[in-house]
């Protein structure tokens, strides 16, 4: 199955599919600790096998390219939340600044690698990392974390977070808000801009929850896919693409 995410990227700054069924009750208290991920997580559409307790997906394209069906969504895995392993390369995702929830940093060199743009979620996210990286001649968009081992089977939860996005070579950050109905298996949310360089009408995401993953329907104007992370679905994160507004990015949010 080919994931339908079309991302127009000229700047990039930081979805695993499991068979974990819904269980547990409707406890809506925000959990504090990451859950133990299942030992074996089946690969998603990418087809490549990975190792590590932190799982997710990434898209890698030559800088300035438009992501389309010819670009594969890659499974990614790591034993360190702050390490991104993709295409045989390793990137340090440890936030440069410890304050706030998402940071944009124009770092030029780190661990022997050069960067033009480095945008990654911060320590508010205990179980996941997401964002963009532009390094060398390649652009990266990614989301990874500790997949929720036991999903709530009922209850409604609110999630508040941030997003990083790009359009026509301009990158920016914004806010994300989601409502998860675990009994109805629905996730509905909105991404809004806080950036003066990238403005757009709110992006609406309407997805179906399947195990600890969620995805929009095929052919939706806004395509998105992602996962719940941590104990009791404490966090969520994923990728999105709005083909009408030619906008794409990654997002994360924390259960309130």
Regions found by a protein language model. Give the residues of each.
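Bacterial N-terminal signal peptides that target proteins for export
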Residues: 1-9
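Mature soluble binding/inhibitory domains
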Residues: 21-256
């Amino acid at each position: 199955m080919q994931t339908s995410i079309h991302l127009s990227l000229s700047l990039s700054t930081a979805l695993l599919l499991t068979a974990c069924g819904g269980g547990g009750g409707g406890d809506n208290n925000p959990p504090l600790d990451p859950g133990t991920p299942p030992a074996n997580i089946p690969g998603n559409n990418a087809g490549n096998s990975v190792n590590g307790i932190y799982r997710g997906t990434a898209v890698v394209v030559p800088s300035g390219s438009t992501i389309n069906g010819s670009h594969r969504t890659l499974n990614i895995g790591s034993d360190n939340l702050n390490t991104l392993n993709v295409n045989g390369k390793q990137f340090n995702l440890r936030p440069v600044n410890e304050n706030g929830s998402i940071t944009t940093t124009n770092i030029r060199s780190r661990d022997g690698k050069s960067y033009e743009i480095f945008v990654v979620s911060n320590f508010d996210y205990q179980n996941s990392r997401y964002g963009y990286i532009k390094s060398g001649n390649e652009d990266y968009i990614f989301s990874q974390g500790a997949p929720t081992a036991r999903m709530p089977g009922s209850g409604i939860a609110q999630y508040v977070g941030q997003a990083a996005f790009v359009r026509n070579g301009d990158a920016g950050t914004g806010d994300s808000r989601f409502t998860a109905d675990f009994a109805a298996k629905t996730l509905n949310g909105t991404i809004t801009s806080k950036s003066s360089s990238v403005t757009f009408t709110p992006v609406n995401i309407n997805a179906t929850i399947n195990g600890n993953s969620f995805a929009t329907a095929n052919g939706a104007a806004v395509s998105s896919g992602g996962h719940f992370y941590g104990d009791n679905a404490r966090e969520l994160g994923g990728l999105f693409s709005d083909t009408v507004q030619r906008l794409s990015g990654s997002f994360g949010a924390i259960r309130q």
